[in-house]
């Protein structure tokens, strides 16, 4: 089958968006310390095998609704040190998500349904860590 890339980190490269042409075999993608301002719907489409996504230290203000739904196996999401004003939509639907870094953003309000699914009997993994300090 040849080689397949599992881990990729592109840091301090002045990226303004998530590259759409990286290998879809990636399990870990770290794009920290760039200039990414938004996550749009199709940005994560090909990265369905990711279990760790690092987007800390960017300028992300907006995460389009539904864009995280392409990451069904995601366990860790690093969105610290950005410019988010609210918790991204769709976190409760990521059933394996355990760690969410949202510290050092501009989040002023956290809703009761921002992290947990609505309704009884909906199964998901327990969170090991959610960071919201310095908002």
Swiss-Prot record:
InterPro entries noted in UniProt: Leu-rich_rpt, Leu-rich_rpt_typical-subtyp, LRR_dom_sf, SLRP
Where does the record place its LRR repeats?
4-24, 25-46, 49-72, 73-95, 96-117
Where does this protein reside within or beyond the cell? Secreted, Extracellular space, Extracellular matrix
What does the PTM comment state? The two attached glycosaminoglycan chains can be either chondroitin sulfate or dermatan sulfate.
Q: Which SMART domains would you find in this protein's record?
A: LRR_TYP (SM00369)
One Pfam family this chain carries? LRR_8
Q: Transmembrane segments in this chain: where?
A: none
One Gene Ontology cellular component = extracellular space
Tissues showing expression: Found in several connective tissues, especially in articular cartilages.
Keywords, comma-separated and alphabetical: Extracellular matrix, Glycoprotein, Leucine-rich repeat, Proteoglycan, Repeat, Secreted
Q: What are the annotated glycosylation sites? A: 65, 106
On subunit structure and binding partners, the annotation says:
Homodimer. Forms a ternary complex with MFAP2 and ELN.
Q: Which family does it belong to?
A: Belongs to the small leucine-rich proteoglycan (SLRP) family. SLRP class I subfamily.
Function text: May be involved in collagen fiber assembly.
Q: What is this protein called?
A: Biglycan
Supply the source organism for this entry: Oryctolagus cuniculus (Rabbit)
């Amino acid at each position: 089958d040849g080689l397949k890339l599992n881990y990729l980190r592109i840091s301090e490269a002045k990226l303004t968006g998530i590259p759409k042409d990286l290998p879809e075999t990636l399990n870990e993608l770290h794009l920290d310390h760039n200039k990414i301002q938004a996550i749009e719907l199709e940005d994560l489409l090909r990265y369905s095998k990711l279990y760790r996504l690092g987007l800390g230290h960017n300028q992300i203000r907006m995460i389009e609704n539904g864009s995280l739904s392409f990451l069904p196996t995601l366990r860790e999401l690093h969105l610290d040190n950005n410019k988010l004003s609210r918790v991204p939509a769709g976190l409760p639907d990521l059933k394996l998500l355990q760690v969410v870094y949202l510290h050092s953003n501009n989040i002023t309000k956290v809703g009761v349904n921002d992290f947990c699914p609505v309704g009884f009997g909906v199964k998901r993994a327990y969170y090991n860590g959610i960071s919201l300090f310095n908002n």
